[in-house]
Amino acid sequence: MRNIKIELADKDRLRIAGVMSGTSLDGVDVAIVDVTDAGVVVKAFDTVPYPGPTRKELLRLCSGNSVDVADIAGLNVILGEIIAGAVIAVAGGAKISLKSIDLIGSHGQTIYHDPGGRRFRGRQVGFTMQIGEASVIAQRTGITTISDFRPADLAVGGEGAPLVPYADFFLFGRSGTCRAIQNIGGIANVTYLPGNGKIEEVLAFDTGPGNMVIDEIVRRMSNGRKSFDRDGRIAGSNQVDQGLFDELMKEAYFAKRPPKSTGRELFGAEYVDRLVAMAGGMGLGYEVMAATATAVTAESIAGAYRKFLPSLPQEMIVCGGGAHNRTLIDMLRERLDPMRIEPMDHFGIDCDSKEAVSFAILAYATAKGLASNVPSATGANKPVILGKIVPA
């Protein structure tokens, strides 16, 4: 029998397909990356959209409402097939042989995340669940797959999130410059890199909503014809309503101290239902709601920097879909002047590929037997190796 751990650990360079599907539920991001201890080279990246029915099923599973366990089990398998197909498609499109790929690092799709937990049979239990069956991915592609990265951090008292700080430090933390890596996906999260090269001083947490609330408002406004505010045009051509803004900024999550993480459970469809009802009572239209929600994302990020970071960074490097929202970026620049704010593209990594690249780096760490949670970010009581290895 092959000793996969030794086989992988002995290679200086690993070619890894990092796979991410985030809270926006847009589709499967695949980045094929050559990783060494010195850094990464991205060989291919693309997003494979979810089929419409699959996205609807995922939205239903992520709603927080009760669902049939058979639906979870079935979609776990189907999503494994979709992820495998996405890896095969992206590799084929880039003319990369599957045999040249050493590993797949798959985050899967989060359908529930409650690190604070609840009382369950007399115990306080924190939990997280990502689906996208790794055994299916490994068998369809013929590539050893690492998945289920979050539970190990929860098992040692952490939030199970954010996990990207290890990758942020790996990519950007050894420059000597104090930086913030600001991801704006469905949820917005920040990694604070102190500039002194010490990973134990890295901080990271979810600041609040990223694109999630804006996207849902735009979907409702357009009756599903649009899924996001392209370039921030809707927000940029409408006024922020101060009354609605003030009410939304009262959200308790914004004042909670890190470590903290959040998701669709807090800022999903039910949150938007309440926002729409509140705005309707004020006589406001969807366009003003979109502008105000954009301002809430900007202020929740800027406010978190002012309240929770040891010092204001010299640079903010922005990634995720929100990096394309010009209105949102302008709002951040206004609030955080004179901080330099630039998209990650300026540093050689596609804004949209960053999280998929991050899970390639996390898979690399696991293959090398390295702990890759950051306790100062997640609140864990010790560093641990993340993920489960499924041989092909």
List where the protein language model places each region.
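Conserved phosphate-binding catalytic cores of ATP/NTP-utilizing and phosphoryl-transfer enzymes
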Residues: M1-D12, T110-D114, F120, V125, ...
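Short beta-strand-loop/turn "lid" adjacent to the catalytic site in phosphate-handling enzymes
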Residues: V69-I131
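A contiguous, well-structured pocket-lining segment that forms one wall/lid of small-molecule binding clefts
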Residues: G224-E315, R326-M339
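N-terminal phosphate-binding or glycine-rich loops at protein starts, especially the Walker A/P-loop
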Residues: R2-P49
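Glycine-rich phosphate-binding loop plus the immediately following alpha-helix
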Residues: D26-V33, F45-R60, Q139-G173, A180-A255
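Glycine-rich phosphate-binding/hydrolytic loop that grips phosphoryl groups
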Residues: L25, A291, A295, D345-A392
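Glycine-rich beta-strand-to-loop/alpha-helix junction loops that act as flexible
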Residues: S21, S106-Q109, I184-G186, E315-A323, ...
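Conserved beta-strand elements of the Class I
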Residues: R15-A17, C178-Q182, I317
